[in-house]
């Protein structure tokens, strides 16, 4: 994007959702204290006892303190954005990772005793359900590694219908992270044979309020279904981010009211604000 283009984009963004504290708690070096696997997913536990409690749906920027080659100046250079999946009583933060490239490969290889650089919590999380009347019925919809923000949100809500979609049985091992969830797999190897949105449609009755995170095609299907049934929905969008606090404009997405940066105005957006996802 040209300098003039960035200036115009910055002008269109200014004031859209109010001012932000860009990096409210600073970057800090923290130890990895837990690691477990669920199929292709790695759940990494990071000790952050003095850090602020994240809101469900917020994220953090993570990078291995020691990169490939053993030095702090080795590749990969940039951190990666991950939803906070869970916060334990001792301040431990859990993150759900999947090895899909150099940055996540390095993070997935970390073990207890290694350190990470963490910046967060960042962004806007899920807004609580409308208290009614009528009482709202939360429905959580996740796809793949998009289960992460639904874990902490499910913990906070306590009582919600959770629907999870995965590629196959190996990936569906991640469903164990949200007990009681109903599962759909593309190949029919676990649960419903088909898309998770096929499980969602019957749930869109009176009082339903949807919260979703997953790949763009899934989120677009959720958005369209909820619009068709006049059901409110909040979508946690995924995007590559270089900074996490609004400086790089790498996570800009269009809405009905103009462009927003997912790292400061999201990653959770009202579905009604989006004409389309992806």
Regions found by a protein language model. Name each.
Residues 149, 216-217, 238-267:
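Local cysteine-cluster metal-coordination motifs and their immediate loop/turn environment
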Residues 198, 259-278:
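Short, basic/aromatic-enriched C-terminal tail that caps enzymatic domains
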Residues 1-29, 131-135, 275-278:
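Short, low-complexity, intrinsically disordered N-terminal peptides in bacterial proteins
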Residues 102-240:
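FNR/FR-type flavoprotein reductase catalytic core
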Residues 13-114:
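Ferredoxin-reductase
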Residues 219, 225, 245, 269-278:
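Nucleotide-activated chemistry modules centered on ATP-dependent adenylation/adenylyltransferase
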């Amino acid at each position: 994007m040209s300098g003039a283009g960035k200036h115009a984009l910055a002008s269109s963004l200014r004031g859209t959702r109010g001012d932000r504290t860009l990096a409210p708690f600073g970057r800090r070096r923290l130890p990895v204290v837990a690691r477990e696997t669920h199929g292709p997913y790695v759940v990494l536990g990071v000790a952050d006892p003095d850090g602020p409690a994240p809101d469900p749906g917020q994220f953090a920027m993570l990078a291995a303190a020691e990169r490939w080659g053993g030095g702090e100046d080795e590749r990969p250079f940039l951190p990666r954005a991950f939803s906070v999946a869970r916060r334990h009583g001792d301040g431990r933060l859990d993150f759900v990772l999947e090895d899909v490239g150099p940055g996540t490969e390095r993070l997935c290889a970390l073990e207890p005793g290694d350190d990470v650089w963490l910046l967060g919590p960042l962004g806007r999380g899920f807004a609580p359900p409308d208290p009614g009347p009528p009482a709202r019925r939360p429905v959580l919809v996740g796809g793949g590694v998009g289960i992460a923000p639904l874990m902490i949100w499910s913990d906070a809500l306590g009582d919600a219908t959770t629907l999870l979609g995965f590629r196959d049985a190996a990936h569906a091992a991640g469903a164990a992270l949200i007990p009681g969830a109903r599962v759909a797999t593309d190949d029919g190897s676990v649960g419903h044979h088909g898309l998770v949105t096929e499980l969602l449609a019957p749930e869109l009755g009176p009082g339903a309020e949807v919260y979703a995170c997953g790949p763009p095609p899934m989120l677009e299907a959720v958005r369209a279904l909820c619009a068709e049934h006049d059901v409110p929905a909040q979508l946690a969008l995924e995007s590559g981010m270089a900074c996490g606090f609004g400086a790089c404009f790498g996570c800009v997405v269009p809405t009905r009211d103009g462009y927003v940066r997912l790292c400061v105005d999201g990653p959770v957006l009202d579905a009604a604000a989006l004409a389309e996802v992806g």
